[in-house]
Amino acid sequence: LVGSEMCIRDRNGAIIAEPGEFTKRAFLNGRMDLTQAEAVMDVISAGSDLALKAAQTQLDGGVGAQVDELKDNLVHVLAHIEAYIDFPDEDISPDTASDLLARLRSMEEKLAALLRTAEGGRLLREGIRTAIAGPPNVGKSSLLNTLLGYDRAIVSNIAGTTRDTVEESIQMAGLALRLIDTAGMRESSDVIEQAGITRTNRALETADLVLEVADASMPRVKDHTAPALTAPRLLILNKCDLGVHPDWKAVPGIRFSCATGEGRKELEEAIIQAFSSSLPSETGSSLVAINARHQHELGLCREHVRLASESISRQESPEFTALELREALTHLGEITGAVDTEDVLGAIFSSFCLGK
C-alpha cells in the first residue's frame, strides 16, 4: 500500500489533483491567461506540426496579445464616450466622431481577421476528415494502406470487401488527416452492403475533404458519389501502373499507383492547395488559430462594436454607445479570463488529464 492513493491521503493529508488543476492554479494566480491555459492541452494533443505551432503560439500569448490590443482600443474609445457622458453640455464634435468611427471600423476588420482563423483552427485541432470514396474494387482500401504505410484495411480482388468505415490518422504535409475508408458506392440489394453505403454517405456528409478514387486502368463508370457535397474533392486516378484507359486520358486528376507510390507528392500538394484559404497563415514563427469558444466571444464582440459604430453615426445619446462598448469589453474579457465564470473554467479544465 506504500505510495497508494489511500495511504498518501489518509496518512499525509494529501489530496488527489483534479483534471487540469496545476494549469488552473497557474491561471488563478495570474501566471497565464485563459487562452494560454487552453493551449496547454492543445500542445499535448497536437496531431501535426502545424497544430503544434498554433498551440505554441497561443501558449506564448499570441492570441491573448491580440485580444489585449483590441481591449486597449475599446477602452480608448469608451474613455472618450464616458467623458461626454460626464459633461453632457458638450456634444461629440464631427472630427472626434470621425476618429472614433475609424478606430472602431479598424477593430471590426481585426476581429473579422481573427474570426477567419476559426475554421483553420478546427482543422488543425481535429484533423481534416478525409473520406476515401468511389465504386467497389478501385483500390480505396489499398490507398488507405499506402498512405498509412502499413496494412490497416483488408484488401482483396472481390468487389465489396469493405462493408464498414475504417478510420485512421496520419500526418501529411504538416497537416493531420483523419482518413476514412468507406464501402464502395453502387446500387445493391444486399442488406449488409446497403448499410455500409449508408455509413459511406454519412462519412461523406461530414467530411472536410473527399478523395474520389477511380480505377484508371478500366473504362469509366457511373459516379455514385453524392453530387451535393460541399467539401473539396480530389480525383485519384488509381492503378496507373497498369496503364491508363482512353476514357481517362483527358480527365484531370492525380495519377496514382498504390503499387509504386507514384502520385503521393502530387496528392500532398493538392491537399495543401485545397485548404490554402482555410488554414491560418504563418507570420514568422507564429501561427494564430482561435478555437470555438474564442470564435463565439469574438463574434459577439464584433456585433457590439458594430452597434457602437451605428450609435455614433446616428448621433445617439453617448449612454447607448457606452453600453455597447462595455458589452464588447465583457466578451473580450471572457476570452482571456479577465471576466470569468465557474462554468466556463470548469468546462475548460475538465478536459485536461489529472494534474496537468
Located regions from the model:
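Inter-motif core of Ras-like GTPase G domains
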Residues: 193-216
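A common structural junction motif
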Residues: 9-17, 275
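Short, small-residue-biased leader/transition segments that mark boundaries at the very start
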Residues: 1-8
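A conserved P-loop NTPase coupling/switch region
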Residues: 17-49
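Noncatalytic alpha-helical scaffolds and linker/capping helices
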Residues: 175-178, 183-187, 192-195
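Generic enzyme active-site microenvironment
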Residues: 179, 213, 236
